[in-house]
Amino acid sequence: MSKFSFNIYHQHKKARSGIIVTAHGEMRTPAFMPVGTRGTVKAMLPESVAETGADILLGNTYHLMLQPTAERIVQLGGLHKFMNWDKPILTDSGGFQVMSLSKLCKITEEGVSFSSHINGDKYMLTPERSTEIQYLLGSTITMAFDECTPYPATFEEAKTSMQLTTRWANRSRNAFVKREGYAQFGIIQGSVYEELREQSSKDLVELDFEGYAVGGLAVGEGQELMFKVLDYAPDFLPQNKPRYLMGVGKPADIIGAVSRGIDMFDCVIPTRSGRNGQAFTKYGTVNIRNSKYADDNKPLEHDCLCPACRNYSKAYLHHLVRIGEILGSMLMTWHNLTYFQNLMSRIRAYIKLGKDFDFDS
């Protein structure tokens, strides 16, 4: 089994490209991770997701602990076998969903108590329990339990939240079962305050995680402020470890973040947009519901190799989406995931050539 490692092969200014080696294979960086919240990427077969070029998927601890439960998944051979995906899987810690989906959640030093959004059952999620669930799932990359600081937050609010995340990170690290080829990432918090981001980074770097995530962004602060934070936040982290920007997925945001030193991304944008009839292309977004596509016999993108573009016209996709056929969601999602993987491939090629990014989609 391979050791977990991150090898940077090319660098242009702050942008890096390389390979992360894991127990479940290699992943190219910069990487975009499709979101498979409940053990599936919506409207896609796992093997179809692989065909888009994805090297890694994201799963969600909160949803999987509720249904079908981590204990059931481990009895069935782990998440990889359960969903027929043999490449790396990263699972988030569940904290963000607990705090955003549960109507009744209480944050204490111990963890977060909450009621299930499904049936109201009461649960307690702690750093130790979150780490245990991710271990049972067989996650390749486990995320430390954190509090995602809401925006806006005062300096004192952000400081209190960041310090709690640091204490939880210590507990998460102690609970993590180290195995060859597996990793745990710490999550940097501190809102939009440079002093807090620096302190959070120092505290978590001391714990020697295998990688680090920049959390608490893309929560309403806007691109300009997000980029301002990213102008300095990655510089506080080790050069030789992966950096993951959580929940960011707009093409222009990805390009801007890569140029500031970020290596990994995840977002529901390509899948959710696809199900809603929006396609991403190099020339901008296409709302396939628009009546102007009813008689358009051309593909979404002439040089895209996804099934939607190879085999079907915009008129056919328009028809499927307008009448609510499942195939419409499948083809639009397949195209969007292919577009995002093509975008990452293009980004990696520019870094290898030492070129500035001259595109934003």
From Swiss-Prot:
Substrate binds at residues 92-96, 146, 189, 216. Its EC number is 2.4.2.29. It is an enzyme of class 2 (transferase). One of its GO terms (cellular component) is cytoplasm. The keyword Nucleotide-binding does not apply. GO terms for molecular function: metal ion binding; tRNA-guanosine(34) queuine transglycosylase activity. Its cofactor is Zn(2+). Keywords: Glycosyltransferase, Metal-binding, Queuosine biosynthesis, Transferase, tRNA processing, Zinc. Residues 247-253, 271-275 are annotated as: RNA binding. Zn(2+) binds at residues 304, 306, 309, 335. InterPro entries: ArchSynthase1/Queuine_TRR, TGT, TGT-like_sf, tRNA_ribo_trans-like. Pathway: tRNA modification; tRNA-queuosine biosynthesis. GO terms for biological process: queuosine biosynthetic process; tRNA wobble guanine modification; tRNA-guanine transglycosylation. The keyword Mitochondrion does not apply. The active site is at 92 (proton acceptor), 266 (nucleophile). It catalyses: 7-aminomethyl-7-carbaguanine + guanosine(34) in tRNA = 7-aminomethyl-7-carbaguanosine(34) in tRNA + guanine. Gene3D superfamilies: Queuine tRNA-ribosyltransferase-like. Binds 1 zinc ion per subunit. Catalyzes the base-exchange of a guanine (G) residue with the queuine precursor 7-aminomethyl-7-deazaguanine (PreQ1) at position 34 (anticodon wobble position) in tRNAs with GU(N) anticodons (tRNA-Asp, -Asn, -His and -Tyr). Catalysis occurs through a double-displacement mechanism. The nucleophile active site attacks the C1' of nucleotide 34 to detach the guanine base from the RNA, forming a covalent enzyme-RNA intermediate. The proton acceptor active site deprotonates the incoming PreQ1, allowing a nucleophilic attack on the C1' of the ribose to form the product. Belongs to the queuine tRNA-ribosyltransferase family. Homodimer. Within each dimer, one monomer is responsible for RNA recognition and catalysis, while the other monomer binds to the replacement base PreQ1. PANTHER family: QUEUINE TRNA-RIBOSYLTRANSFERASE. This is Queuine tRNA-ribosyltransferase. The lineage of its organism: Bacteria, Pseudomonadati, Pseudomonadota, Alphaproteobacteria, Rickettsiales.
